[in-house]
Each structure stands twice: as C-alpha cells, then as structure tokens.
Amino acid sequence: MGDVVVNTEGGNRLELSYYTENGVNVVRVCDWYTKLGESGIHFSSLGNNMSTFKSELRNLQTKYEQWIATAKSNKVQEVEKEMPCKISYTTYDCDAYAGNATKVIVQPYFVIRNYVPRCEIRIWQYFYDRTPNYNVWYLSPKDIPFLISAIDKGYQEYIAKSTQKRKTEDLFK
C-alpha cells in the first residue's frame, strides 16, 4: 500500500492510500487531523474503485463550476444546497478505534458564505456501539482537480515502488 499526504486549499489534510483488490485498483482517501494529545487521527474514508472515484470527483467538479458561475452571475451572497452527485465511500473507519461502519451517508453540498464558494463533503458514519462520527471536508474550487491530480501522481509512485519491490524480490529467489 502506498501513502501520499496532500493539503487542500480548503484546509483539509488528506491521506491517499493505494492497493489492488481482486484485480481492481483501489484508492482510499482519509481525512487526517490532529487532536489535543493525539496526532495523526484518521477520521473518515472515501473512495474505492479508483477510476469510479475519479469520475465521481470530475462530475462533482463540473456541477461545482456550473453552480459557481450561476451564483456569480446572480450575485448570490449565501446559499447551502445539496449537490446531486454521488461520492463513493469505504465503510472502514480509519481512526484509532478502527472498525466497520454499519451505515454511512456521504453528501456533497454547495455552500456560499459572504460570496465565497466552497464544496463541502459531509460524512456521517454510524457504528453498532459508538456515537456516530460526523466530518466535513472543505474543498475550494481548486481542490477537486488538485485531488484528482494527487490521486494520479500518488498511484504512479505506488506502481513504481511495487515494480521495484517485485524486481528486488525476484533477485533473491
């Protein structure tokens, strides 16, 4: 598994992990943050099939750009609207109390406050024996293409490391 950490303009620190499962390339994107007394807490995890997830991000970006243009042309100062876009998720909770969620809701929102647009991906994770987790990823207009680019770049690094590891292992058979 390869890991890449990216910091978004919207203020999130995301960790991208790559692996192959049953012949399918998988990416998992975890929000990474620090709490008092604890560092490197993974809160929630999006992604799955890498090509599907990137396609969902592109669709989200397209809708986001359309709504930004509409808001600017109409001088919208404040709005909060659910975006009609699907985002994949994994039920794996990446934090210190790791486990599988029994229910996950992932919903992107288009939000403008004082004429400043952003996309919020809101994530609710429900577990058998715990208080539900709630997390928000704040993404600026530049963050979604940046995230897609980081996924591609990180995956290429993952492939290069996997290939090198395989070559090294073959030397010592």
Give the ranges of each region predicted by the language model.
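Positively charged, low-complexity terminal tracts
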Residues: 1-173
